[in-house]
Amino acid sequence: VLSAADKANVKAAFDKVGGQAGDYGAEALERMFLSFPTTKTYFPHFDLSHGSAQVKAHGKKVGDALVNAVGHLDDLPGALSALSDLHAYKLRVDPVNFKLASNVLLVTLAVHVAAGFTPAVHASLDKFLASVGTVLTSKYR
């Protein structure tokens, strides 16, 4: 459960992200594909090369979903219900991949929000991304 301080930290970090959420989402995907090559199996139809239009488009979806989640911190299950259904029932993504995605998203945010990426912000973002992952895997049960 995110505390009031966690929510404030997450909102402040995403305020610094601004309109770059899609770019950061694409960068995080590239990091994930390089760091965890098995994640590529979910994207056999994508051009996974650096700067690929498909990776950029999917990165925008990831970034937009996270921005939406930040706007609904008090109702993450409601905000992410459709994505949870998609990943559980249609795409059948292995739940461990959400932890991998969280890891590379944290790294990407740390790079771009450097000055504001304090230990407290890091902890809050980690809790937020873990909460998002929990919601996205909730339909697997």
Curated annotation (Swiss-Prot):
| Modification sites for Phosphoserine | S3, S35, S49, S102, S124, S131, S138
Q: Where does O2 bind?
A: H58
Q: What is this protein called?
A: Hemoglobin subunit alpha
Record's keyword terms, sorted: Acetylation, Heme, Iron, Metal-binding, Oxygen transport, Phosphoprotein, Transport
Name of the gene this protein is made from? HBA
Described purpose of this protein according to its UniProt entry:
Involved in oxygen transport from the lung to the various peripheral tissues.
Among Gene3D superfamilies, the record links this protein to: Globins
Give all residue intervals belonging to the Globin domain: 1-141
